[in-house]
């Protein structure tokens, strides 16, 4: 058994080998490997399946009580400075290994069909394998230095995959935006790592927390400096997990292929930030101010993402802001000390969001032949509608993911989100109020997406007035039905259900979306009063107060407010965007007749639409204040450098040149001239002395 645990590094090694093999093939045998393009996906999927099976084995060993395993290779670089490379296998690691590998396998199977006709098919699988290997290496890392190495690899792979279609200007700009934004966070992360090494003398996670606690107990730590280091370190997860104010890269990342959007938003890049905060949780707990910053950052991010998602027209960007909001929930949970709830929501959200993104990919794939291949058309929900009758399996799986994300029992996210809502309310009512309000907004915008995409009539052939169509407001049919459009009967193209290869991952991901939440159900046995997930995670950190665990019926009773507000959001979405039943039409006509109400609704809807369209004006503020401000500052610096600094230097040179040119005529080689000049100067000197 010990020999098996010593080979945990095989888990990231297999996808890394797949990436290396495909990369070598593309570099040395580009023409030959393109003839066997299907073989490249088979290699990637097969190697990742091996890694997934190993991950399940290690996960099973951990939940059955096996001890935590650490294995390190050490190098003494300079005197007492030792660099250790290895792995750490504990319950948190084992859960993340299973999460990353299972989602990545489903994404790769899906990509085999989705990307089959793309010229970069093999390159895509090469990048995808490297991306997965980087994330697996990150979760296995036992220290901050190794985390930072794989952290940068994850960032590099995201840059390559977001800009995969780099010939499209929007994709090229999006990958640069993601890269630059994450550089800000990575710089802070590096400062935090170096700062904590200065304090504790260690990069190792276990030693770091232990030494920090000892120094804190003996009052040998400057708390201001330690807090500053923790905030710098937290800046890395803020950027990587798209937290306010470094969230601006996430919606632009939708320019990449849809399968990579699913992987980024479910189990890799954005999960890396949450994972690092969870790994550093024992240390952050000793700094209350930092925990407060984490919780408020999460709450603001959750609310901001939900409000921006309210009126998005782009299907993928709506889901992207949903991811931002749910990541805010996770960060909020970790900030209030609810370690288990935050990680539980990371797990449940990953499967639900992977299902939603892959479902959106199937929708986009079927819409492209009808409306065009540009994202402004194929991803625009205004051109969708009524897809349930053409894509029933995709619609059902998408509905399951939507119900889960809304927090409707018994779907997965209900159990994790409700625990976050209750714990945040008990911790601080204002945070709880923000969390509950955001839950209602989540239900509204998710069902808005579902209704606009799958319900009603198909709008893909309404091309008479594209501009008016694209300006659909938050109030849906209240204003949308005022416009009359004619069907282009010449067109015979209609959406089609995705093929079996693309449907298989959707059906498989539906299983954890429905059932994985049950691992967090609280139950009351004679020998245990905790849930399964808490029991597993307790092996690595005892951060959950079991005395506050509720019985199952009490838990369901406390869930009534969250479920009620979710249903309220769904009802509003149904009223505004749902199928137009006869009684709803009458109510909407009555509402439109009341001019005062109509004016209020229009003004409010315009505000929400502009808030969503301009992304809460944050991108515009960054563009005006930072980009334009920096360019203006550069112009000033350039002017000073060119005309003042260079002017002084060049002026001295010019003055010396002309001075030399003038004085050279004085020197003529005649002694009488020199004598006359000396006498004349002496005369002037004596005359000046006499006058003075």
UniProtKB/Swiss-Prot annotation:
List the InterPro entries: NADH_UbQ_OxRdtase_chlpt_su5_C, NADHpl_OxRdtase_5_subgr, ND/Mrp_TM, NU5C-like, Proton_antipo_N
**What are the protein's UniProt keywords?**
Chloroplast, Membrane, NAD, NADP, Plastid, Plastoquinone, Quinone, Thylakoid, Translocase, Transmembrane, Transmembrane helix, Transport
| Pfam families linked to this entry | Proton_antipo_C, Proton_antipo_M, Proton_antipo_N
Q: How does it sit in the membrane?
A: Multi-pass membrane protein
Listed transmembrane segments: 9-29, 39-59, 89-109, 120-140, 147-167, 184-204, 219-239, 258-278, 289-309, 327-347, 354-374, 395-415, 425-445, 503-523, 555-575, 643-663, 671-691
A GO MF term:
quinone binding
Q: How does it assemble?
A: NDH is composed of at least 16 different subunits, 5 of which are encoded in the nucleus.
Q: Which NCBIfam families match?
A: NDH_I_L (TIGR01974), PRK06590.1 (NF005141)
* Name the UniProt record assigns to this protein: NAD(P)H-quinone oxidoreductase subunit 5, chloroplastic
Which organism encodes this protein? Marchantia polymorpha (Common liverwort)
């Amino acid at each position: 058994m010990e020999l098996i645990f010593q080979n945990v590094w095989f888990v990231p090694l297999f996808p890394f080998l797949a990436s290396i093999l495909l990369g070598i093939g593309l570099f040395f045998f580009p023409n030959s490997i393109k003839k066997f393009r299907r073989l490249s996906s088979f290699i990637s999927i097969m190697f990742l399946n091996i890694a997934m099976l190993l991950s399940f084995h290690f996960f099973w060993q951990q939940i059955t009580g096996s001890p935590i395993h650490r294995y390190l290779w050490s190098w003494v670089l300079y005197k007492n400075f030792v660099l250790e490379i290895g792995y750490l296998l504990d319950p948190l690691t084992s859960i993340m290994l299973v999460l990353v590998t299972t989602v990545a396998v489903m994404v790769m199977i899906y990509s085999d069909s989705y990307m089959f006709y793309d010229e970069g098919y093999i390159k895509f699988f090469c990048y995808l394998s490297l991306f997965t290997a980087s994330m697996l290496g990150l979760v296995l890392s036992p220290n901050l230095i190794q985390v930072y190495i794989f952290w940068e690899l994850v960032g590099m792979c995201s840059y390559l995959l977001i800009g995969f279609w780099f010939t499209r200007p929007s994709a090229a700009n999006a990958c640069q935006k993601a890269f630059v934004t994450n550089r800000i966070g990575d710089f802070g992360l590096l400062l935090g790592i170096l700062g904590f090494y200065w304090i504790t003398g260690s990069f190792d996670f276990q030693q770091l927390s232990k030494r920090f606690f000892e120094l804190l107990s003996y009052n040998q730590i400057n708390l201001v400096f330690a807090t500053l280091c923790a905030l710098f370190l937290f800046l890395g997860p803020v950027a990587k997990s798209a937290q306010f104010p470094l969230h601006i890269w996430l919606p632009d990342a939708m320019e990449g292929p849809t399968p990579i959007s699913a992987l980024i938003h479910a189990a890799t890049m954005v999960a890396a930030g949450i994972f690092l905060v969870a790994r550093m949780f024992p240390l952050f707990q000793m700094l209350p101010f930092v925990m407060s910053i984490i919780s408020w950052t999460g709450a603001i991010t959750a609310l901001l993402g939900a409000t921006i998602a309210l009126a998005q027209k782009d299907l993928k960007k709506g889901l992207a802001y949903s991811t931002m909001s749910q990541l805010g929930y996770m960060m909020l949970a970790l900030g209030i000390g609810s370690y288990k709830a935050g990680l539980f929501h990371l797990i449940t959200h990953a499967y639900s969001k992977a299902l939603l993104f892959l479902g959106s990919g199937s929708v986009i794939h079927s819409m492209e032949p009808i409306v065009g291949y540009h994202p402004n058309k194929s991803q625009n929900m205004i051109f969708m509608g009524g897809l349930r009758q053409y894509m029933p399996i995709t619609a059902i799986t998408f509905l399951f993911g939507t119900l889960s994300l809304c927090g409707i029992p018994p779907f997965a996210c209900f159990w994790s989100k409700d625990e976050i809502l209750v714990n945040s309310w008990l911790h601080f009512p204002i945070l709880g109020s923000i969390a509950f309000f955001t839950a209602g907004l989540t239900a509204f915008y998710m069902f808005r997406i579902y209704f606009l995409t799958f319900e009603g009539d198909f709008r893909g052939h309404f091309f008479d007035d594209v501009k008016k169509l694209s300006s659909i407001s938050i109030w849906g049919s209240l204003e949308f039905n005022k416009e009359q459009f004619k069907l282009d009967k010449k067109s015979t193209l209609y959406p089609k259900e995705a093929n079996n290869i693309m449907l298989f991952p959707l059906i498989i991901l539906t299983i954890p979306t429905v059932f994985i939440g049950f691992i967090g159900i609280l139950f009351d046995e004679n020998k245990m009063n905790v849930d399964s997930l808490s029991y597993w995670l307790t092996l690595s950190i005892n951060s959950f107060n079991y005395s506050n665990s509720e019985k199952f019926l009490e838990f369901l009773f406390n869930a009534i407010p969250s479920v009620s507000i979710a249903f309220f959001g769904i009802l509003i979405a149904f009223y505004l965007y749902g199928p137009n039943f006869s009684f709803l039409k009458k109510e909407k006509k009555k509402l439109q007749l009341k001019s005062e109400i109509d004016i209020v609704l229009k003004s409010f809807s315009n505000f929400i639409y502009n808030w969503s369209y301009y992304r809460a004006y944050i991108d515009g503020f960054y563009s005006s204040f930072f980009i334009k401000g920096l360019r203006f500052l550069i112009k000033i610096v350039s002017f000073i450098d060119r005309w003042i600094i260079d002017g002084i230097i060049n002026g001295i040179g010019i003055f010396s040149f002309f001075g030399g040119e003038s004085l050279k005529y004085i020197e003529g080689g005649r002694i009488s001239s020199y004598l006359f000049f000396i006498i004349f100067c002496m005369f002037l000197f004596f005359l000046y002395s006499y006058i003075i």
